[in-house]
A protein has these predicted regions:
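Gly/Ser/Thr/Pro-rich low-complexity, intrinsically disordered segments
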Residues: 1-182
Length: 182
């Protein structure tokens, strides 16, 4: 008798309908809420960010800017919307980026294809390059989302709330920035 092992490397999460926003405070009534930019050990956001059209660039990095506009996002060297943050680009216009980091971790990305934006999350630890390749198979653009110690996130679908990374649930109040949909 033959057995077939089907390996599912990533899970796709559809976003609720609504405007993507970014905040340095966790919104209490969001239908989707996911950590976004990297932070240091004291919770300071690493990189420039933008809230309600105002720039905060004290910790600017060389990473690309991820602008949130309506229900879509844009990866660019300049801000293209009222909300945004700096983060690693995994896929840009169907070109998969390569990384030298060989550490394996559970990974998450904000992605888009011709049908719109969605979240991809690895089902087990993988390198950043392997995760970028998986994203490249499923989307035209992808930006990494911080998982770190505080990688809790959720998407509400009616009465169902699905934690994206259960270990982060207990430290969710330590995260300092979020992508969300009200």
């Amino acid at each position: 008798m033959a057995y077939i092992h089907i390996e599912k490397r990533v899970t796709r999460f559809e976003l609720p309908v609504g405007e993507l926003k970014w905040s340095n405070k966790r919104p209490q009534n969001a239908r989707m809420c996911i950590p976004a930019a990297f932070t240091d050990g004291r919770g300071r956001i690493l990189g420039a960010y933008r809230i309600n059209g105002k720039n905060y660039e004290a910790n600017k990095t060389m990473r690309m800017k991820v602008s949130l506009k309506g229900d879509m996002f844009f990866i660019s060297s300049k801000w293209m919307g009222d909300y945004g943050f700096q983060q690693l680009t995994l896929v840009n216009d169907s070109k998969v980026m390569k990384f030298h980091d060989t550490r394996k971790s559970v990974r998450r990305a904000l992605c888009k294809d011709k049908d719109g934006a969605f979240i991809l999350q690895s089902n087990y630890p993988m390198t950043m390059s392997d995760f970028a390749l998986e994203c490249g198979k499923r989307c035209t653009n992808a930006t990494y989302l911080d998982m770190g110690e505080y990688g809790y996130g959720y998407i509400k679908n009616g009465f169902f709330t699905r934690p994206l990374y259960i270990w982060g649930y207990f430290s969710r109040d330590k995260q300092t920035n979020w992508i969300y949909i009200e």
